[in-house]
Design a protein with these regions (language model features):
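Anion-binding alpha/beta catalytic cores of soluble intermediary-metabolism enzymes, centered on
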Residues: 93-157, 198
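Short, well-structured alpha-helical segments in soluble
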Residues: 77-89
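Helix-enriched interaction subdomains in cytosolic or periplasmic regions
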Residues: 1-11, 104-108
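Short, high-confidence coil segments that cap the C-terminus of an alpha-helix
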Residues: 90-91, 202
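Adenosine-phosphate binding glycine-rich loop
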Residues: 2, 9, 15-21, 25, ...
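Glycine-rich phosphate/diphosphate-binding loop of Rossmann-like nucleotide-binding domains
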Residues: 40-55, 136-251, 263-273
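Short beta-strand elements in bilobed, periplasmic/extracellular small-molecule ligand-binding domains
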Residues: 35, 57-71, 185-187
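Short glycine-rich anion-binding loops that position phosphate/pyrophosphate groups of nucleotides
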Residues: 96-103, 211-213, 237-240, 288-289
Length: 324
């Protein structure tokens, strides 16, 4: 059987339509949500990412501002930029594009952002809110994964869910979100024993390890005539350039192999492409989780605008680094 494809681009379009309506309502009430992006230096990849985020703001009607400190900016200079944005009532969300230059203390910069404006969901205060189940801003990629599951009506409550990876940005918040949705959650990592057996029991797999084609098809609960098989959310985005690796991964996908040979590289997830023949449902790479990250950034910006105005305490919360 062939897995059902969980198309992130379609869900992106659905959510963008909903956000446009909400932004119109807020704007008519005198509140136009706004996002400020801080791009340090002239890294081409970072410039491209920020450009796509600004374009998304324009698409749904958010105001946006781009601040471009030089690549030589110091930690103290960037802290001053963040402080100004924290105080600006027209700014609901602050995005610091990573990576920052090596002379900058990245952790200190991220923790200086007002948690109420932390639309990336990286701040320890927002992670703490997630742990306790309180309203807050959730890291964009895990939030996007949850939207994929819910909007495709994948059963979560009571499901055995396995999260591969334990990063602060994806793995840990993903596990918490699944737990709050009443799944039974297992977090796996490089020290996990008998990983294939753990995965074979999973109804939901979220792969976020950063290893191309790591999860093998026979590690995934297969779909049968009476059971749906595992739903696989592939967060990995790995660019491969080795021809032998490509031939191994794409041996059953001649079109993808031809594209690799023509381009010299390809994007693959953490799940082997052959999993499409074993899983019950699967996010493609590219086109699955990827479109959802910017989508949830936009959603968080609108959410921040609501929360800041509805809850003065939430808006007033400042990080220790920011207070210094």
């Amino acid at each position: 059987m062939t897995a059902r494809i969980l198309d992130g681009s379609k869900i992106r379009d659905q959510i963008f339509a909903e956000l446009k309506d909400e932004v119109r309502l807020l704007t008519s009430a005198g509140v136009r949500p706004g996002l400020a992006a801080v791009l340090v230096g002239e890294n081409p990849a970072s410039q491209l990412y920020v450009k796509s985020k600004i374009a998304a703001c324009e698409e749904i009607g958010l105001s946006s501002a781009l601040l471009t400190p030089p690549a030589t900016a110091s930690t103290l200079e960037l802290l001053a930029v963040i402080e100004d944005l924290n105080r600006d009532n027209d700014v609901d969300g602050i995005l610091v594009q990573l990576p920052l230059p090596p002379q900058v203390d990245t952790k200190r910069i991220l923790e200086a952002v007002d948690p109420a404006k932390d639309v990336d969901g990286f701040h320890p205060v927002n992670l703490g809110r997630l742990v306790s189940g309180r309203p807050g801003l959730v890291a964009c990629t895990p939030a996007g994964c949850m939207e994929i599951l819910r909007r495709n009506e994948i059963p979560i409550e009571g499901a055995n869910a396995v999260v591969l990876g334990r990063s602060d940005i994806v793995g840990k918040p993903m596990a918490l979100l699944l737990m709050h949705a009443n799944a039974t959650v297992t977090i796996c990592h490089s020290k996990t024993r008998d990983l294939p057996e753990v995965l074979r029991r999973a109804d939901i797999i979220v792969a976020a390890m950063g290893k191309a084609g790591f999860v093998q098809p026979d590690w995934i609960k297969p779909a049968t005539a009476s059971k749906p098989g595992a739903a696989v959310i592939d967060v990995g985005t790995n660019r491969i350039t080795d021809s032998q690796e490509a031939e191994h991964l794409f041996q059953n996908f001649p079109e993808r192999l031809e594209k690799f040979r023509a381009k010299g590289s390809a994007l693959v997830g953490d799940v082997h492409p052959d999993a499409i023949r074993s899983a019950g449902a699967l996010t493609p790479v590219p086109g699955g989780v990827g479109p959802m990250t910017i989508t949830m950034l936009m959603s968080n910006t609108v959410k921040a605008a609501r929360l800041r105005r509805a809850s003065p305490k939430f808006s007033a919360t400042q990080s220790t680094a920011s207070a210094r």
